[in-house]
Amino acid sequence: GPSKNTTPILDILDREQVPATFFVCAQDANENYMPLVADIAAAGHQIALHSATHQYSKIYASTDAFWQDMKALRQALEPYVDVESIDWLRFPGGSTNTVSHRYGGRDIMKTLKAQAEDKGYHWIDWNVCAEDATASIGAA
């Protein structure tokens, strides 16, 4: 996300008093929903980086390409939140993905994880796969 589902999700989180972290993308499909990032932050939820494009072939072509994608995402977020306060990210495909090997070599994820830490980012994965990256399920 953000997406058309973000406002209803925010309503549920507010009603149930549950804090959340939103791993944000800036793809063309959610361009019109980017102002909702301000609502997410105003509600006290955490904003974290995920990807500007979510196109593995571009993101993982090199470490420079990955950080260019993060820069583009940060620029897309600047009108809505203090991007300097964002210090969490989730790698597209996860930190142990193998799809990145196809584009940036076998060691690209090891290098990116070290670079992320050197840049002051904490990175996170997940422990349950909702299959939302493999099917046409709506984003948050």
Model segments located where?
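Alpha-helical scaffold elements lining the catalytic groove of polysaccharide deacetylases
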Residues: 8, 55-81, 97-140
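Flexible loop residues that form catalytic
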Residues: 94
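Active-site beta->alpha N-cap acidic-glycine motif
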Residues: 1-91
